[in-house]
Amino acid sequence: MKLRKRKRISGTPKRKQRAQRLALLKQFLREHTWGVMIAGLILIAVVLFIFVIAGASPKTADETQTAQTDTPRYESGYICAITTEVPYYDEDLSQSGTVARGMEVTYATDKTVRQDGVTYYMTYFPTLGHGYVSEENLTQNVHEVIAEKTVYVRTPQNLRPEKDSYVLGSLVEQGTELQVLDYEGTTNGVVDLYKVSYQGETGYISGQYVATTPEAANEVYDRFGVYAIHAGRGDKWGGGDAESLDYYPRTKADFADNPMPDPCYAIYLTCDPAVLGDIDKYIEYAKSTKINAFVVNIMDGTSIGYNSPVYEEYSPTAYQYANNTVEEYQAVIQRIKDAGFYVIGRLTTFNDSFFCQDHPEYAIADGSGDPLYVAASYWPSAFCRYVWEYKVALAIDAVETMGFNEIQFDYVRFPDGTGDYEKEGDIDFHNEYDETKAQAIQRFLMYATDILHEYGVYVGADVFGETSGNYVTAYGQYWPAISNVADVISGMPYPDHFSQNGTYRPWEHPYETMVDWAESAAKRQSETPSPAIARTWIQAYDAIRPPYNSYGAQEVADEIRALSEQGLTGGFMAWNASCSLKKLEELRPAYEALE
């Protein structure tokens, strides 16, 4: 088949019209050459001027590009990241500093710097000025502030099923992977509470107890040689080893609306109605000296301060034997507070015969399963979380109902004198999680401190004088571990509690005895990265051992001076179990001379 050739058509009307227009254009350019050139130059100048004003000079792909208008648009947002801090930069993208994630900020959407495909927005911080922040670290959704999807347990803790509850769930061990569902608040970039999931259980855990990688969670904390100090202190007496306890630094509480006296000088009151009935006399005495605080019993073993509804739930026997009504006790505490004094509520923790009567299943038991009477009491096991919940619930009620500034846990230990039972295997501690005694005590204090800080109060822990030694005691108290957690640690180095050495009686030499003890306690304070305030119980009663020497103003002043000279400057609490007003008058010169 032959292809047909296209016929050439010429001289059509449209082609003639185009030729005529082209001829006219050539004639115009010949006649107006200079005018056209001038117009072109003007157009080029205008374009260049616009580039200069707008700062839009062309850059290579590797150079920083800045975009800015005279009227930038502002958006509110939050700093987000997987880390606790985020860098911010100057216009050249040189780092200027860091800000904490979770911070609410304002950023300009039209004032940006772009580099390597990432946009940085000019961001304004509430207190730290401004700087450029990566788009990857800005969000408008508060639930996207934390970027991590999993966290790993660094310090073993019991999950809290509800964020606002003191009730405890399962224990999660070190290294356990937790799925992050949400979070509640941040403080300096650290998450206050993670909402997590673990083996089908949902709960909350503080951000201070987790890490974002398995390596960080299992890392041994040894800054400043902390780990090395404790690693060699093994389980010598049955209380556990020092190495397995937690020494990560903790931020100590400092409540602006609840200032703690510094130093704190306190006298002690029982919850006996006869004592509390004389409250005006004690207040008058304190006002006439340098005393600035009171310690008042919430409960002391079987001496119950008031009929708290918490007892109705956990220990009806304690409720039945309360010394005062809520209103009577409340009136006393309010009078102390109205007089301007700091009030500490003392609460015995794991020494509680009434609770063991009501709940023998949680009592330390003998081999046959019966509650064991040891050291003049029945003892709820410090391993049992239900006991923890009971004591913290009681502390919360005392804070909310009575207005205490601080909760002091006494008998925060296992009973002493159980060594023979343990050797013979004739004792049951109900140790559900296979913890050491020292681990249980420290973990209880972590739990209690975390909860009570939410109520704006401080937490103190009383410890035996023996804990100034460089070992874990048989009853689970180890000074550095407790000091690292509590806000206040209070040794009880009463001179008449020290053993006689030949003819030397320590209680006849209060200054020397207290110097030796305080020197050792100060060493223990230096062995923890975030030590508590050391506020010591002092002997303010006559010696209970021969020759029953009197403790007057000079002896008490010597105790106070010895503590201060050794660096234990947090103050003192004067122990006199009878709360004798007569003895207080004898001691007046010592308390008037306080600085």
Please identify what each model-predicted range represents:
Residues 279-304, 401-406, 488, 563-571:
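Catalytic domains of carbohydrate-active enzymes, especially glycoside hydrolases
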Residues 486-500, 509-515, 520-595:
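Substrate-binding cleft of secreted/luminal carbohydrate-active enzymes
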Residues 89-101, 161-174:
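SH3/SH3-like (including bacterial SH3b) beta-barrel domains
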Residues 255-274, 331, 345-397:
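Active-site-adjacent "subsite" loops/lids of carbohydrate-active enzymes
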Residues 342-352, 408-411, 437-474, 529-543, ...:
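Aromatic-lined carbohydrate-recognition surfaces of secreted/lumenal glycan-active proteins
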Residues 289-324, 416-423, 584, 591:
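Aromatic-lined carbohydrate-binding/catalytic grooves of carbohydrate-active enzymes
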Residues 100-134, 173-208:
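SH3/SH3-like beta-barrel superfamily modules
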Residues 62-74, 124-150, 197-252:
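Boundary regions of SH3-family modules and the immediately adjacent low-complexity/disordered segments
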